[in-house]
From Swiss-Prot:
Protein name from the UniProt record: 2,3-bisphosphoglycerate-independent phosphoglycerate mutase
A Gene Ontology molecular function term of the record: metal ion binding
Function of the protein: Catalyzes the interconversion of 2-phosphoglycerate and 3-phosphoglycerate.
Gene from which this protein is expressed: apgM
GO biological process: glycolytic process
Pfam hit, one: PhosphMutase
Region feature (Disordered): 160-179
This protein's pathway: Carbohydrate degradation; glycolysis; pyruvate from D-glyceraldehyde 3-phosphate: step 3/5
Organism of derivation: Methanosphaera stadtmanae (strain ATCC 43021 / DSM 3091 / JCM 11832 / MCB-3)
Amino acid sequence: MKGIIFVIDGMGDRPVKELGDKTPLENARTPAMDKMVEEGITGIMDTIRPGVRPGSDTAHLTLLGYDPYEVYTGRGPFEAAGINVEVKPGDIAFRCNFSTADENLIITDRRAGRIQSGTDKLAEVINNEVKLDDVEVIFKESDGHRGVLVLRGNGLSDKITDADPKHEGNKPKTVKPLDDSEEAKFTADIVNKFVEQSYELLKDHPVNIERIENGENPANIILPRGVGAVPHVTPFEELYGLKGVCVAETGLIKGIAKIAGMDTIDIPGATGGIDTDIDSVHKYIVDTIKSNKYDFILVNVDGADEAGHDGDIFGKRDFIEKVDNIMADLKDMDDIVLFVTADHSTPVSVKDHSGDPVPVFIKAPGLRVDDVKEYGERAAAKGGLCRIRGTDVLYIIRDLMNVTQKFGA
């Protein structure tokens, strides 16, 4: 029996007027998931706790059975691990965005038009030409508009704020120390210099000149956020006795899995957006499940989250329908415990994560089937699982896999 957590990233939402006051999930045609819901058990989940807006990083740590309040140091180290950038003790790592700024350094597009090519050339300039007071700069492009920055040197601290303003129409935030240490003050100054230099180096780069000529937003500034040092995470297999693998599109999710000691699968053509090669994603998910190499599989598809951040109502709904085609192959598998969920809600009206609980369902042999017939936020709230937390998920899955021990005599 295999355990599978299938995360449709950012799927949860709120009723949308344009969809007849339904959510994108409720409005989507999802016959495969509806069938599994009819034969399974449903509920809603607060990944962290009610009202807390989870990051994708803290949400996935929780789903894998870790307490993010204990092991989470910041997003950066996980992003770095996901693209094989080493973070040594003493280093600090950041998740970065390739973004667009105008001549006054006002951020006009935090994701530089969802840039998909040319970032390797921009990263090369950053690595070769940024100079920061005896601090080594290691910068690497990730998928799409994402990148990773590692700073290496003496006297660095992760007790600093972000440069990313999180919303367009603002200048990059001035990075500030979070304590009175000289290390934090020094590091904040270093990161501010990095942001300034990134703009000067990238604004006239040939990649960006070409993008402007093509009517595309230039990727002319780097915005670091989510700083963290190396986290201390007990390997997943050591904790739970399950050999695990992660099939995901983005570096963040693969990085979390790698730091947890799990194997990862790279998917050709996967972008982490609604334009991803869904057929390739489909193939690699199904092939991994059928491989019989693993006891536990974490799956993440990211397009619904991207659409939520962009406020793309119909793009989000349509992507959910594409994911349902993948589910059609899982529907008839008998030897799996399948837990389908979102890691958080990303309402199109908010264009960011929210604290709304997410809909979940379980497909497994011998379940106590409830009366819910379709997959949606409000339907799932009537299900037999009731309202659970992310910390409950692995307990439930492992119990249904029959690999747990009795608590007590």
